[in-house]
Amino acid sequence: MKELTLDSAVATLRAGGVIAYPTEAVWGLGCDPSHEAAVHMVLRLKQRPIEKGMILVAADLAQLEGWVRLQALPDARQRAVLASWPGANTWILPAGPRAQPWVTGEHSGIAVRISAHPLVAELCRAWGGPLVSTSANLAGEPPARRREELDPRLLRLLDGILDGETGGLAQPTPIRDALSGNVLRS
């Protein structure tokens, strides 16, 4: 497995690669959400149906410009979303023009999070935008909380791994619908 530095992780992403990196609760797989082939590789690696859509993670709200339409939410819902970030809160927001079907799946919204995890935020800043962030496990298998738990079947197919520690959350981040406030994953 190729060990990555922050700079080599960014170079790998720019080349359409898929990397593993630690997130708030579990290890994640990441790629450029604009790179269709890279997103399809993540879906194949995880054996995840495209219809489910993907989560994007960013360092700040500006990185989500064009990906989401926050202004389409009522003011109170906008305030609730913004008050929860940066943090371990994933929201389904109305999708913007940059959000392609290989990221949104069969949905009109897109799942996004502005992370407070130091390495995730640093990676997104170095990359210059949001990244796909999905748990580094095969569909139906438990997610890896520690690097040692990463599935060797996935590891050998990745373009590299950015080492670090997860943020210590007991569960993956909750997912809520920003329009309704409904919790989709707790």
Swiss-Prot record:
It comes from the Bacteria. Its EC number is 2.7.7.87. Disulfide bonds: none annotated. It is found in: Cytoplasm. The keyword Cytoplasm applies. Its main location: cytoplasm. Pfam families: Sua5_yciO_yrdC. It catalyses: L-threonine + hydrogencarbonate + ATP = L-threonylcarbamoyladenylate + diphosphate + H2O. One of its GO terms (biological process) is tRNA threonylcarbamoyladenosine modification. GO terms for cellular component: cytoplasm. It is an enzyme of class 2 (transferase). PROSITE patterns: YRDC. Keywords: ATP-binding, Cytoplasm, Nucleotide-binding, Nucleotidyltransferase, Transferase, tRNA processing. Residues 3-186 form the YrdC-like domain. InterPro entries: DHBP_synth_RibB-like_a/b_dom, Sua5-like_dom, TC-AMP_synthase, TC-AMP_synthase_SUA5. GO terms for molecular function: ATP binding; double-stranded RNA binding; L-threonylcarbamoyladenylate synthase; tRNA binding. Required for the formation of a threonylcarbamoyl group on adenosine at position 37 (t(6)A37) in tRNAs that read codons beginning with adenine. Catalyzes the conversion of L-threonine, HCO(3)(-)/CO(2) and ATP to give threonylcarbamoyl-AMP (TC-AMP) as the acyladenylate intermediate, with the release of diphosphate. Belongs to the SUA5 family. TsaC subfamily. This is Threonylcarbamoyl-AMP synthase. It comes from Stenotrophomonas maltophilia (strain K279a).
